[in-house]
């Protein structure tokens, strides 16, 4: 009889991947990133363990969306106080904080529990082409 092998925390191997977001569609890129963060691309994937890898995203300000989403897509946040709803369009958020666009898209594709929060911490998004993770020797992710 075959036994299912559950990887232990010592045997899980974590790699670093680099993704260039220049001229990539937001949703298509976010699904690939979420897959790697969860570890679903590995044969050792286990739903209740964090088996995923680290992902570095550069050129976040050059991400693209199709159609009229650039002028019509809205991002909402709430301060928690009465009347504290703030709404911002994709264009203005891309000028101000382009990292948040990719972070929000990926976060919505991860589990909405403590495991998803743990996996989200392995995502590093940067506005320009430079990143401080050269020592980790990130491998370019084919996307």
Curated annotation (Swiss-Prot):
InterPro entries named among the record's database cross-references: Ribosomal_uL13, Ribosomal_uL13_bac-type, Ribosomal_uL13_CS, Ribosomal_uL13_sf
Any one cellular-component term (Gene Ontology): cytosolic large ribosomal subunit
CDD domains: Ribosomal_L13
UniProt cross-references to Gene3D superfamilies, sorted A to Z: Ribosomal protein L13
Keywords linked to the UniProt accession: Ribonucleoprotein, Ribosomal protein
Taxonomic superkingdom: Bacteria
Biological process according to GO: negative regulation of translation; translation
GO molecular function: mRNA binding; structural constituent of ribosome
Keyword Signal in record: no
Signal sequence coordinates: none
Quaternary structure and interacting proteins, as annotated: Part of the 50S ribosomal subunit.
HAMAP family (alphabetical): Ribosomal_uL13
Function: This protein is one of the early assembly proteins of the 50S ribosomal subunit, although it is not seen to bind rRNA by itself. It is important during the early stages of 50S assembly.
Assigned protein family: Belongs to the universal ribosomal protein uL13 family.
Protein's UniProt name: Large ribosomal subunit protein uL13
């Amino acid at each position: 009889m075959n036994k299912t092998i559950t990887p232990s925390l010592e045997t899980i191997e974590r790699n670093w991947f680099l993704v260039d977001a220049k001229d990539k569609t937001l949703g298509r890129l976010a699904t690939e990133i979420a897959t790697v963060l969860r570890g679903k691309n590995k044969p050792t994937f286990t739903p209740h363990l964090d088996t995923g890898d680290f992902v570095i995203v550069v050129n976040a300000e050059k991400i693209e969306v199709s159609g009229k989403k650039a002028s019509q897509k809205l991002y909402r946040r709430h301060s928690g106080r009465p009347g504290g709803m703030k709404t911002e369009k994709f264009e203005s958020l891309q000028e101000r904080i382009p990292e948040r666009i990719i972070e929000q898209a990926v976060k919505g594709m991860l589990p909405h529990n403590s495991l998803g929060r743990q996996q989200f911490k392995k995502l590093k998004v940067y506005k320009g082409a430079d990143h401080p993770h050269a020592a980790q020797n990130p491998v370019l992710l084919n996307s």
